[in-house]
């Protein structure tokens, strides 16, 4: 029996790790959040214009945001790469042998890429986005998963509401490269005929015939659900997420608290009150919200003084969330960047090297913050119009989710004081409007300096620090 290895504390994340031959021992989940002992293959099921790609993209964005390496594989895009010019629905007719051959080759090419991603590139979840409307096709994909050691989870989207289908068709026409520069009525007619090509052979997931499979069936964009044999934690997270999203038109407003007394002094964290300009911003925010005339707006704040003072000026009910509190800077709370460089130069350099994963001594990392904020994302997905008054690091995390930003980009997203970001979900993404409320404030954004080496001189460490009192 091997003797226990020595432990050492990782300087970046502040977690204890075993050492082997003088080097830290790596483990399978070094780069991501490990929630399952084997990769997961998510297989979309459903007729065209049922929201499969919408679900695929949202699910991929969510899983990547919480730290699970995920990639979407859209078979339609593989087909467009092979067949450069789409002509008509006849390509999808069941008796079109050439079309069938090309579609099968594209599906196999996508599965090869799935295998590469999950088995060679360290991926945890692959989303296979295609119609997969026959039991035979789904069995082929399931067998592929079994042969490669993947857990397979099916997500079927069923729509019988004509209004939902019509709205989906409009979105597909707007977003699909197949119908660029095509007459609208002609495109609609062709797409309806394309759907008919699948309808006769469509076999929905069946509670008896498919009782051994793991799946969720989503009816009419979340009116009801059927869930069967959830196999592990990651599948339960997927089900929970899919049961929270909706497509009702709405806007989410994100802003930071008004300028604080510590912002003026260039100090991070703490629980200060608003500066005079911060109080002026709170009044301007109240006027802005009133002018917007937003139906049933909900207002959320953190439990920190500066966000609550900002919300008080609105004169409306608001809800305080502890999870919306600013990132905990640990031993560096209420310090300036200059003081951190003087007292903890190693920590300052390590944070610049990997700002997303770096954890303050006795504090948090952005990675920790994302995990803390997941309940907020779930509730934002459930809600309609919401104003979130929060903090710089928190706002960056929320913004990264809605804009699908990578972990490396997240800590450097610009979220200036006294500016409201209006996020409006659209077909496969999010429209962003930035509204500055004309109240001056200090700049608190610090870019990554060019020199992030531990031995750098102080002036190179501090070159990107914004001006302050």
Swiss-Prot record:
Taxonomic lineage of the native organism: Eukaryota, Metazoa, Chordata, Craniata, Vertebrata
The protein's name in its UniProt record: 6-phosphofructo-2-kinase/fructose-2,6-bisphosphatase 4
E.C. number: 2.7.1.105, 3.1.3.46
Keywords on record: ATP-binding, Hydrolase, Kinase, Multifunctional enzyme, Nucleotide-binding, Phosphoprotein, Transferase
Residues where Phosphothreonine is found: 444
Residues holding beta-D-fructose 6-phosphate: 79, 103, 131, 137, 173, 194, 198
Biological-process GO terms, alphabetical: fructose 2,6-bisphosphate metabolic process; fructose metabolic process
Any GO CC annotation of this UniProt entry: cytosol
A single MF term (Gene Ontology): fructose-2,6-bisphosphate 2-phosphatase activity
Region of interest called 6-phosphofructo-2-kinase, as start-end residue ranges on this chain: 1-249
Organism: Homo sapiens
Regulation: The most important regulatory mechanism of these opposing activities is by phosphorylation and dephosphorylation of the enzyme.
